[in-house]
Amino acid sequence: MSKNDDILLFSLSNSHQLANKIANLLKIELSPIRIDKFADGELIVAPQVPVRGRRVIIIQSTSKPVNDSLMELLIAIDSIKRASAKAISVVIPYYGYARQDRKAKPREPITARLVAKMIESAGATSVLTWDIHSLQTQGFFDIPFDSLEAVWVLMKHYFSAYKDSSNITIVSPDYGGVKRAREISIATGATLAIVDKRRSGKNQVEINNVLGDVKDRDCVIVDDMIDTGGTILGAAKIVREKGAKSITIIATHGLFNNNARQHFQQAIKDRIINKICIADTIENEPFDGLEIVSIAPAIAKCIEIYSEGTGSMSFVHDENSKVLFAKKIY
């Protein structure tokens, strides 16, 4: 019996492309699942093969349409649990609602915790996600929860084009991303710069200054996601004004909300940005200057660890990041 014979892999509506890549790497077929919507908008999701006694993997990003994607996931978990699956592992490449992880103002909800409890109550036995916005979300779960860092996969892709890091500067677009940028800077030997950003209102960003030298440098602005793009575009503009030689945007999740795609395309045409590199946690149509790097191999490795019942998910992180630390990428 193959080590993957006990696994059933289901893809929901938001992650078909990624799930197909994972299935091909694991050399297994995606199992059929029915996803229908009634006239009133209600969803029905049900596996079309027996799942009794099997280990089940469900792949679904809870990105746009966020609420439909989340309900589809919850109903899928519930239907599979009621069909007597042995275990249900949920792979959520992009975890929606993670930014609502605290009460920023009086009377606001902590929706990240609510979503965690809904996933648990539906019947999930473990959760795997990538570059979750706030690591404290893992504390909202009472089941095994792993958030791995796809940013290392993206950094390996970027650095593969360079012989060394002598002219590269890692740029954090705000103070919230300094820890991530510093880790990459230390790992690669690149220098570090920080954009001094102040938020003046909802989706309103005021850029003040750059801390660190970016003049004539190949700059990499690193963030966990591209939402409306205001923060990253503002950072890119001031870094370019300060004399950067090139600017690459690296972000795990490409949400591209509102008119972000058009704004980034224009920024590339205007040579403010040279290119953008994202992971395929969310399905995106490519455009000139956008590179999409797949995390399917990393997820497939996680599923193999899960199916074998030995090892650690942190191995997948180490497998990507240790190459940078050892500087074997050059």
Swiss-Prot record:
Ordered alphabetically, the record's keywords are: ATP-binding, Cytoplasm, Kinase, Magnesium, Metal-binding, Nucleotide biosynthesis, Nucleotide-binding, Transferase
> Under which EC number(s) is this enzyme classified?
2.7.6.1
Instruction: One GO cellular component term, please give it.
Output: ribose phosphate diphosphokinase complex
Which PROSITE patterns does UniProt cross-reference here? PRPP_SYNTHASE (PS00114)
- Summarize where Mg(2+) 2 binds, as residue positions: 174
The residues that hold D-ribose 5-phosphate are 199, 223, 227-231
Q: Which domain of life is it from?
A: Bacteria
Annotated signal sequence range: none
Matches recorded under InterPro entries: PRib_PP_synth_CS, Pribosyltran_N, PRibTrfase_dom, PRTase-like, Rib-P_diPkinase, Rib-P_diPkinase_bac
Q: What are the subcellular locations of this protein?
A: Cytoplasm
Pathway terms, separated by semicolons: Metabolic intermediate biosynthesis; 5-phospho-alpha-D-ribose 1-diphosphate biosynthesis; 5-phospho-alpha-D-ribose 1-diphosphate from D-ribose 5-phosphate (route I): step 1/1
* Cofactor(s) recorded in Swiss-Prot or TrEMBL: Mg(2+)
Name the positions where Mg(2+) 1 binds.
133
Cofactor binding comment, as recorded: Binds 2 Mg(2+) ions per subunit.
Q: Explain the purpose of this protein.
A: Involved in the biosynthesis of the central metabolite phospho-alpha-D-ribosyl-1-pyrophosphate (PRPP) via the transfer of pyrophosphoryl group from ATP to 1-hydroxyl of ribose-5-phosphate (Rib-5-P).
User: Subunit structure, per the record?
Assistant: Homohexamer.
- Family listed: Belongs to the ribose-phosphate pyrophosphokinase family. Class I subfamily.
- The protein in question is named Ribose-phosphate pyrophosphokinase
- Give the encoding gene's name: prs
